Each structure stands twice: as C-alpha cells, then as structure tokens.
Amino acid sequence: MAPKIFIDGEHGTTGLQIRTRMAGRRDVELLSIPEAERRNAAMREDMLNSADIAILCLPDDASKEAVQMVSANNNVRVIDTSTAFRVNPGWAYGFAEMDGAQADRIKAARFVANPGCYPTGAIGLIRPLRAAGLLPDGYPVTVNAVSGYTGGGKQMIAQMENPDHPDAITAPHFLYGLPLTHKHVPEMTVHGLLDRAPIFSPSVGKFAQGMIVQVPLHLGDLAEGTTMESIHAALVAHYAGQEIVTVVPLAESKALSRVNAVELEGKDTMKLFVFGTPGASQVNLVALLDNLGKGASGAAVQNMDLMLAS
C-alpha cells in the first residue's frame, strides 16, 4: 500500500508547488479535503491523523495547531514549512546537505522543519566555513539577498501582478526587513553555527521565482592564511558527492560577468559561487536557487522522500 501524504494548506503557494512536484507519482497516495470542506476542522484533523506524512504549508500558529492534532498519534510524521519549529531541538532541520549526517537525521525523524528560502542559501555558504574553522567566532557576518515575489505568498503575488490591486507594488526592486529582525535570522544563526546573529538585509525583485543570497567576507578577519582558494576548497569538500547542492569551479565563476537570479527557476537545486580577485583581501560568496524550489517546495519533497526511505 502506498504511503499516504496529506498537504495541509495545499491551496497556498508552497502547497500548490508541492502538489505539482508530486503529480503523476504512483508511489504515494495524496489525501485531499474537498473544496467545500476546506474549513471543516473535524475533517482536517481526520486527514492529518490518516496520513503517514503530513506536510504543513501554513502560518506559524496554524502549524502549531496541526502538530497538536497529531501529537498523540505516533503513526503520523510531519514536515512543517513554517518558521515555527526551525530552531526547536526536538525537530530535525530539513536541509539534507547541511552536514554529512543530516540526511540520516531527517530519515529517522518524526518531525522535520523545512528550511526557509533565505537561510538555505546563507547556511549553505556559512556552515561549511564554520565547520572548517575558516570563519572565526565573533565574525560580523552580513547576508544580503533578493527573492522572487512568490516568496511573499498569494498576497504579494496579487500586489505584484495586479496593477489594479489597492496596494499594488510597482517598484522593480525593494528592501524590507528594515529593523533587522527578520524571522529567518534565528535559523541562520543556529544552523549556520554562528555565535552572533548576522546582519540580514532581504529584498524582493519584480520576478516570480528565483533567489540570490550573498555573504561578503574580509579575508584578513578570517582564520590566518584563509584565501579565496581555501574557502572554495572548503565548500567543495563539504558538498562532495552531492547532486542538489553544487559548487561552481573558480574558473567558471571568474568567467562570469553577472549572476542571473532566475537561472534556476523551476529547479530544486542550488549553486554556490566564490567571487573575488586572487590575492585580494575580499571575497563574495553567492548562493543561487529558486525560492520555491530548494528554498521551499522542492526541499519539502526531498525531505518526504528521505523519510519514506527510512
């Protein structure tokens, strides 16, 4: 019998993308609440408790409520895509390539917290350097990023795509999170192995899907002898054998004159780059991904597959 999967919040942006990725699969059975019963709390609870894996695509409070509904049913495993549990030590963090043991942690977990889109890029760049001893304690990490507007969900999609919307957004690019208290900072800090919170400056561009995350570094403030080449080597070693997260060779990065935020649109992979001039004192680390791919729905399906393989 095929494992039963219930997407709680299947009509939202992330939920719809997960359904698209699972269309045509015969190795799982998708449970669904009829459109007319979407607000039927009893039916929702029954669906949650009938699933082998429940994927929660909900706001934080609704996710917490859903987890309570299945807390006594050990037959139900959960993947949550909200920010509610990402730094909870009782949950496995769903970034399988984060370190060599993380995929096995996800396989064995009952509860998996799907990473945020920005943290996927930031942690993907920072954690290998912390693990290799290149990024010292106390380093003032800065993360700059731009996302496609689908990361803002249905409301922002309407604001960006409908010029008649009462709160239409016409700017081609805008900063937000100006008080420096973005909800993704805690998971960047915890899973990036940082001893102080990074300065995080997020922004949105007038494109639907895609993301660039940048972490600029001063080499002179890193571990003694750290170079652009040693940083690249640490990333290559960390992601050796991985197919979803890849490190672009230095020669290929050097040949680029620009990085296109939408290059990986529709893909569930992530590319990492190291930019700089050999012998210079600065480097810029860049992660390229689809905010709805490896940054959300693609990661959720990847985590589901790992859990089903356990």
UniProtKB/Swiss-Prot annotation:
S-S bridge residues: none
A GO molecular-function annotation: N-acetyl-gamma-glutamyl-phosphate reductase activity
Domain of life (superkingdom): Bacteria
GO cellular component, as recorded: cytoplasm
Biological processes, Gene Ontology terms: L-arginine biosynthetic process
Active-site residues, Swiss-Prot/TrEMBL: 117
Record family assignment: Belongs to the NAGSA dehydrogenase family. Type 2 subfamily.
Protein name (Swiss-Prot/TrEMBL): N-acetyl-gamma-glutamyl-phosphate reductase
